[in-house]
Amino acid sequence: WNGASVWGGIFAPTIRYHEGVFYMITTNVTDKGNFLVHTTDPAGEWSDPIPIKQGGIDPSLYFEDGKCYLVSNPDNYITLCQINPKTGEQLTESKRIWIGTGGRFPEGPHIYKKDNWYYLLISEGGTEYGHKITIARSRYIDGPYEQNPANPILTHINRNMQSSPIQGVGHADIIQAPDESWWTVFLAFRPQSDMHHLLGRETLLAPVRWDKNAWPVINGDGSVSLEMDVPTLPQQPFATKPVRTNFKNGKLGLEWVHVRNPHPENYTFD
C-alpha cells in the first residue's frame, strides 16, 4: 500500500456477527471490488479475502432464516441479493430496491428488522457539507420501500460552521445496546479555518428513539452536538496511552495498526 492514493485502499467496512462468526465486508477501491473476511475471534486470525460479485461501494450484510443478504449501491441504486458468506457466491439476481430521496450518491446502505418492518438506512449527498442520512421501510426485504416522511433523519445541511462545529454528518449504522437502548454511529468532520478539517472524518455516537409511527429519531431533532445527554450509558474513562512499548510478551497493541505502511523514520527501536 505504499504510494496509494488518499482515495485508494478500502472504503466503509461493515462488521456483522452471526451464529458465532464475525463478518467484515468492504470495498477495495484500488482494485475496484468488494470482498469479505470472517473469523470467530476478531482479535485473532481472519480468513483470506473472499471476492463478491455484486459491485458498488459500502456493502453491508443482513442475516435471516439461514440466508445472507448483501446490499450495496451499483449504478447509484441501492441493490440487494443473496450470497453464500463462506464462498462469496451470489445466489440470486441483483435487485434494485431504493434510489433514496433524490440526493446524489445514495450509498452506505444497511438493513435492519424491527417489529416486522425491514428498515433500509442510507446516506445521500456525498461525504461533504451536503451529507445526510435517510431511511425507508418495507414489510418485505426486497421491497417496495416507503420513505420516512420526516427524511432526512440526520443532517447538518442547515447548520453553518458558526452554529455547529460538526459538519458533514452521514454514513450511519444503528445498534441496540445490552440495556435495550438504541444508538447510531456515524461519521462527520470538524472544520477549522478556511473550511479545513485536518482530523478528517471522525466517528460519532448519538442516541436514537422510535416515534409513535415506528420511525427512528436521532437525538430528538435530527441534529447532534459535541456533548449530548446519554444517561443510559455509564462513564467509560480512557486509560493513558503508553509512550513506551515493552515487546517482551511478543504481542503488539492496537496502536501499532496503521491505515497504510508506517514511516519508519518516525520511530526508534532500542
Where are these regions (language model features)?
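Carbohydrate-active catalytic/glycan-binding domains of CAZyme proteins
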Residues: 1-270
